[in-house]
Design a protein with these regions (language model features):
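The conserved acidic donor/metal-binding loop of glycosyltransferases
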Residues: 81-85
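N-terminal anchoring/stem segment of glycosyltransferases
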Residues: 1-61, 70-73, 182-183, 195-197, ...
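Conserved donor-nucleotide/metal-binding helix-loop-beta segment in metal-dependent transferases, i.e.
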Residues: 86-123
Length: 346
């Protein structure tokens, strides 16, 4: 396998840290950035300008999807999200898992879903996109008669034959859709490959945990100060109700107050990402049947927040117009906490 291979990423503004890598001879590692403060002895820096005034997020997506003239000297490009750490031999990975002799592009299968319509709902639940933008895009897909369960990619890693014309045509459509509709590239990728007919080799591995890539999480600049609240299971993007409520701080506790808009038996409260924090208590103002906290490592009386959004699941009988107050304590993970939790796990 003598193809010229590059691994590349893009960090705009100060959204991510540039991770160290396990370098492999014969592969070049490129970081495109508009931040001159970012330096690395592992990555070759390629400085870029925002000539189209896209803003940091779309500029990074542009490099991710459309690439850059610098990449045209390579046969194969491997895009890696700025939150991923490259840790394994990538020539072996390309040879064993990507099948580029038969396909011009390879992607990891989404680890949870296989359908754009389900992913659109998840984007609202996890506050990845505005509902109005999602609905506009879903209307477009329905007009195009785009099928359900067509497939869904984890777009954190993309392996492409860099100069393949069908790949370039598909990437152009992908970026156009991203700019026109919702700014979540996972939503517009399946339609793009369906529309152009680009054949993809699907990699059936967890992109976040495998011998070649490891998830390190994006930088969290500030704490989430609002909660997204759902009543019973959120299935219908068009009609089901949710609320966005503020998170207030009083007496070392976080407090969420809201009126329940309909009779229901379960309320889920998404309080956002709090990686490295611990929640030591959660209380509700009304009588309930059960309360669960997910995800995280549950070691009573601690719940350790991980990379995903923290969600409180509250079960009971709730009436329309009923006032509910949620109190919880959250703070930084200390060495004392680590020791106490370690003792409970032994």
């Amino acid at each position: 396998m003598n193809e010229r291979i590059c691994v590349y990423t893009c960090i705009t503004g100060d959204y991510d840290n540039l991770h160290e890598i396990v370098k492999e001879d014969g592969i070049e590692y490129l970081c495109f950035t508009n931040n001159p403060k970012i330096k690395s002895s592992y990555w070759k820096m390629v400085y870029i300008e925002d000539e189209d005034n896209l803003g940091n997020m779309l500029l990074s997506r542009k490099i991710k999807i459309l690439g850059h003239p610098y990449l045209e000297q390579y046969d194969i490009s491997i895009w890696v999200d700025g939150a991923l750490e490259v840790k394994g031999k990538l020539r072996q990975f390309v040879k064993e898992w990507c099948d580029l002799s038969r396909y011009p592009m390879a992607c990891f299968c989404h680890r949870l879903r296989n359908c754009v319509y389900d992913e659109a709902r998840a984007c609202i639940v996890h506050r990845k996109a505005d509902k109005e933008d999602v609905i506009k895009y879903l209307n477009f897909l329905e007009q195009e008669e785009f099928p359900k369960e067509y497939g869904l990619a984890e777009c954190t890693v993309l392996i492409r034959k860099e100069n393949d014309l069908e790949v370039k045509r598909t990437m152009k459509l992908w970026f156009e859709l991203l700019c026109k509709y919702v700014k979540r590239d996972q939503l517009s990728f399946p339609y793009s490959i369906w529309k152009t007919g680009l054949k993809i080799h699907w990699i059936n591995l967890n992109v976040f945990d495998n011998p070649w890539f490891f998830w390190k999480a994006h930088k969290q600049k500030e704490e989430t100060k609002s909660a997204r609240i759902f009543f019973d299971e959120y299935k219908d993007v068009y009609n089901d109700i949710y609320l966005d409520g503020s998170i207030e701080s009083e007496d070392n506790k976080e407090i969420i107050r809201f009126l329940i808009p309909k009779e229901c038996s379960e309320i889920s409260v998404n309080v956002g990402k709090h990686f490295g924090k611990i929640i030591t208590s959660v209380d509700v103002s009304s009588t309930i049947k059960a309360l669960d906290v997910f995800p995280g490592m549950d070691v009573p009386p601690y719940t350790v927040a991980d990379y995903d959004d923290m969600v409180f699941y509250i079960k009971g009988h709730f009436c329309e117009g009923q006032k509910l107050i949620i109190y919880y304590e959250i703070h930084d993970f200390s060495e004392v906490d680590m020791q106490e939790i370690g003792e409970k796990l032994v």
